[in-house]
Every structure is written in structure tokens, then in C-alpha cells.
Amino acid sequence: VKHVPEGLVLGWEYLYDDNKEADDLIAELCYSLPNDEEIIIMSKDGDLIQMMALPNVSLHDFTSMLSDEIIFGKYGITPKQYLDYKSLSGDKADNIPGIRGIGPKTAEKYLSEYQTIDNFPPELLDEEGIELTKLWKRISTIPFHQS
């Protein structure tokens, strides 16, 4: 925010809200634009991977444009599976512990086989595990996320 006046002189527009995180504001902007508008988000925030599930949204990490293939190569999942992956394996940066005994490789394996947490057979997660994944997913979901 301290650079906003300089940006205004250059003609930049900005959006700021004391009650929202940057990724929430970015999501609001993405959903407010017409679906035929190409949107490129420049951020290293992994939470924004979920926005790549929208057909008109691309993510650039300041090094390169990310694609479904790059996300798959890094995580073994698609952008649409990112929330389930994070809910299972956890994310220290966001204080999401995930499910005990499930790390990135196991989450990748399960999602490869069952696609979503909703398709997991009952023996894969106990009742507590199911409730926890729903909680972590709800906490991790950027507002306005549409499945």
C-alpha cells in the first residue's frame, strides 16, 4: 500500500480492503470480469492455483506462465484438484495441517486414482478425516470459488 501513490501517478488502478487478503481480492476481480476476458494473475501465491480451474485465467509466477502440465509436473494433480490436495497433505504457510499420515505423494496417489475427495471409498478416510478435509478445504477456498 505504501507504493500506491507512486502507482497512481503512473496511472495504475488499485484495490485495497483491510478485511480481505490479496488472493481474495484477486478472485473477486476474476469473477467480476466477463468469461471471454483473458486474465493473467502474476503471483507466487500457491493458493491462486485454484483460480486456474477457470477457463479464462492463467497464472504467471514471475518466472514463467504456469500451465496444467507444469502444475501436474510439480504436484501430480490438476488445478481443479489443488484444494483437495492441500486439504489432504497440508500447507505450512497457511497453517493447514492436512490429514495425519497423508503427505504430498499419498495425496497425489489418492487423487490420481479417485480424482476428488468426494470419490474416496469409506475405508480410505475415517469420519474424522472426512470432516477435517472438508474443514481444510473450506478454509483454503478462495471466496467465490466455483467447483
Positions of predicted regions on the chain:
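Extended two-metal-dependent nuclease catalytic cores across DNA- and RNA-processing enzymes
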Residues: V1-S147
